[in-house]
């Protein structure tokens, strides 16, 4: 991997997105994990620290204190403005108002609350929301529709998770963040690889095979292929029926 050229291309892309929208910078959710750290580093490189706002949005009793501390450390390291917004009261207010739902609906409400907060600041500051999704997550739909998937652009969306680990080292992301077990932080004890049912190394190997049109006859391959096909709707704009020929 030519890390310098990859960084340059992504940096140019970020600048182009912001300029095309006549925006004045970006807002991004900083979780204390590797993906958001990498995006923060790239946004600062592209726009300068004064044009990057980080939102740190923990949930009481769920988000690890270490993750909040690491997110703040990254923000201070880069010299960017950050806001810590604890989301528990917002989530509680919504669930009480809306009534009891199933576990999936309640869990997915959290990233949707975070999305609303990001756009609240982005709208107020004339900025875009930078996403932090990687190619592995996007490919299998491992994100919440109109939650963490609700962004204006995805700077690292063409890099697999295993490539992000290498890229982060090149950018200078602290080693302790690179070594962390990846987690969406939606419930206590949650890990990405535990939910996906395989390591990112295994997942990325299969995704690269699918991308090249190579097939494999085993349970993990079939599971990943099912996830890719079943999440296609998450990667597209809402479908529209064609009626112009009837008018």
Language model features: what each stretch is:
Residues 36:
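Catalytic nucleophile loop
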